[in-house]
């Protein structure tokens, strides 16, 4: 104990005030807020250089989840795919950034160019539908309705109506993403051969450095919201493409699917075929089975550059490749690539867990604004499904149908939502609120076709995130036998919007396994961060003024790192 006390006198701050760098000092000592925050968070004397190891007992992932400038990461701890690419530039810089509180990065011209190019590519393939005015109008009308209810109707016999009017914004956002960037995009992939901006996710176990791959692991939750055995990792795939690598002109799979759709789905709304997803998903499985030996999915990421020149850093080029590998890995998990059993449905339970870790109830009915927005954007896919839910019919996905069959369903009063005027009138409080008439005036689209009497009634099964998870899972599972090992990184000129180079790679489980281990041991704090040997990178780093690497103070650093870590472990034991 005496040895520990002596060490603390020499190596730890004598009191909290002496360890923290004040705001006035930061102006003199540090040229930026990131350095100030890092010194304050690590309780370092302002005169010291930055250590190469973490002097606290909080792992990078735990710190990232508890102290983050983005509040959403504190509410719902998670990592993005890019955060797993720890050595794409300099791991030590990434390490410092995490412990500085993950300050928000500045939006540069290069970032803006990249976002614009990605949007251009997305909209070329997926026609955008602007629903902002629809959502604004619905939200305004519903806000008025809620105020009217609360102010004038004291005895509301169905209080659930208020939740159907005004829902959870996090649930609404997730519902819009799953409906459009999973279900709609995967429908595009299987019917037209390609899709852009597709959602994928997985759960990474930082203890064993592997992605969770079993339903039992998904259901095994740890107390608290920071569970290192099940870290949510999310990504958006720039481009999926199904192709016959031996004959790129072969479109037989898609012709057969199109012929099937034209024959069996002859009902249209507007200019779109209305699809019965229950029948579609069952039939397309057969087409995939017949063509699986010839076709495969290629995973591509798009990078933008201001000039027609590749990055000079090998680590940046390698990180771009590994990013596609992570996407391919997670897509494989969601599609049941290695567990091709009829009743596994890993994606379904993974999606439910995805919502749970975000603190979202998957059985809470979607609010009216979200429901109508989903229907407006992709009525060709959801109209008949919503009719099934309204009638209490099964959708053809056993886990979802069984869950609803064995459960008392409170339903969903869409007739009450759109009949608020009548409800208020019956309560002796007349009020005019014809929502359908109001939204019909917004654009050249007939909302009466999608908000028909088949839907404007009391639904027997409420529309929920659980329903969307079920349909998402079925679409992911379509690709279990179409997953290829080809990935690519396309480099586009942000100024000319032209692709100038494509790097092709071959995905292997061994390579992604090694990358996952490297990322996991970084985030769980089991290894030291690796600093860059390319000192030109230091010119772009906020931590350069106090980092030992560019300031040539690394002599004997390996000894100091190992000794420092041992001392730190001893002090905190």
Swiss-Prot record:
Entry keyword Iron: yes
Annotated binding of [4Fe-4S] cluster, by residue: 90, 538, 541, 547
Entry keywords, A to Z: 4Fe-4S, DNA-binding, Exonuclease, Hydrolase, Iron, Iron-sulfur, Magnesium, Metal-binding, Mitochondrion, Nuclease, Transit peptide
One term of GO molecular function: DNA binding
InterPro entries: EXOV
Function: Single strand DNA specific 5' exonuclease involved in mitochondrial DNA replication and recombination. Releases dinucleotides as main products of catalysis. Has the capacity to slide across 5'double-stranded DNA or 5'RNA sequences and resumes cutting two nucleotides downstream of the double-stranded-to-single-stranded junction or RNA-to-DNA junction, respectively.
Protein name: Exonuclease V, mitochondrial
Annotated organism of origin: Scheffersomyces stipitis (strain ATCC 58785 / CBS 6054 / NBRC 10063 / NRRL Y-11545) (Yeast)
């Amino acid at each position: 104990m005496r040895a520990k006390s002596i060490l603390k006198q020499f190596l730890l701050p004598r009191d909290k005030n002496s360890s923290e760098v004040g705001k006035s000092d930061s102006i003199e000592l540090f040229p930026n807020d990131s350095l100030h925050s890092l010194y304050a968070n690590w309780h370092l004397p302002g005169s010291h250089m930055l250590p190469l190891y973490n002097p606290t007992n909080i792992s990078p992932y735990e710190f990232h989840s508890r102290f983050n400038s983005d509040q959403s990461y504190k509410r719902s701890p998670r990592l993005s795919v890019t955060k797993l690419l720890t050595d794409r530039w300099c791991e030590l810089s990434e390490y410092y950034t995490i412990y500085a509180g993950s300050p928000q990065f500045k939006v540069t011209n290069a970032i803006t160019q990249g976002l614009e190019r990605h949007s251009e590519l997305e909209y070329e393939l997926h026609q955008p539908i602007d629903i902002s005015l629809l959502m604004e109008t619905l939200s305004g009308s519903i806000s008025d309705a809620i105020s009217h209810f609360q102010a004038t109707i004291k005895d509301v016999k169905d209080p659930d109506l208020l939740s159907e009017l005004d829902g959870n914004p996090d649930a609404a956002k997730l519902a819009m993403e799953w409906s459009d960037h999973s279900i709609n995009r995967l429908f595009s992939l299987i019917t037209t051969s390609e899709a852009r901006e597709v959602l994928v996710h997985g759960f990474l176990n930082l203890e064993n450095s592997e992605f969770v791959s079993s339903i039992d692991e998904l259901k095994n939750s740890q107390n608290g919201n920071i569970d290192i055995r099940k870290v949510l990792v999310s990504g958006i795939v720039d481009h999926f493409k199904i192709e016959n690598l031996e004959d790129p002109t072969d479109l037989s799979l898609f012709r057969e699917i199109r012929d099937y759709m034209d024959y069996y789905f002859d009902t249209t709304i507007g200019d779109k075929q209305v699809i019965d997803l229950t029948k579609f998903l069952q039939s397309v499985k057969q087409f995939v089975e017949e063509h699986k030996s010839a076709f495969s999915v290629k995973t591509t990421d798009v990078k933008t550059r201001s000039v027609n020149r590749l990055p000079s850093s090998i680590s940046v080029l390698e990180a771009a490749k590994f990013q596609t590998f992570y996407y391919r890995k997670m897509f494989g998990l969601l599609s049941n690539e290695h567990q091709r059993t009829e009743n596994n449905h890993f994606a379904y339970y993974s999606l439910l867990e995805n919502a749970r870790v975000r603190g979202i109830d998957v059985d809470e009915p979607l609010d009216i604004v979200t429901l109508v927005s989903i229907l407006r954007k992709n009525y060709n896919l959801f109209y008949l499904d919503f009719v099934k839910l309204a009638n209490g019919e099964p959708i053809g996905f056993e886990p979802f149908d069984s869950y609803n069959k064995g459960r008392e369903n409170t339903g969903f009063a869409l007739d009450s939502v759109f009949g608020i005027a009548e409800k208020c009138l019956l309560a002796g409080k007349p009020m005019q609120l014809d929502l359908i008439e109001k939204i019909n005036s917004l654009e050249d689209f007939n909302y009466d076709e999608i908000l028909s009497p088949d839907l404007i009634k009391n639904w027997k099964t409420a529309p929920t995130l659980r329903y969307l998870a079920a349909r998402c899972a079925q679409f992911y599972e379509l690709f279990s036998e179409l997953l290829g090992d080809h990935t690519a990184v396309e480099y586009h000129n942000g100024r000319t919007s032209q692709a100038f180079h494509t790097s092709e790679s071959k995905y292997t489980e061994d390579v992604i396994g090694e990358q996952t281990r490297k990322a996991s041991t970084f985030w769980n704090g089991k290894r030291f961060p690796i600093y860059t040997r390319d000192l030109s990178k230091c010119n772009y780093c906020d931590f350069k003024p106090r980092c030992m690497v560019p300031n040539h103070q690394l002599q004997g650093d390996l000894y100091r790192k190992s000794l420092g870590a041992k001392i730190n472990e001893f002090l905190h034991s």
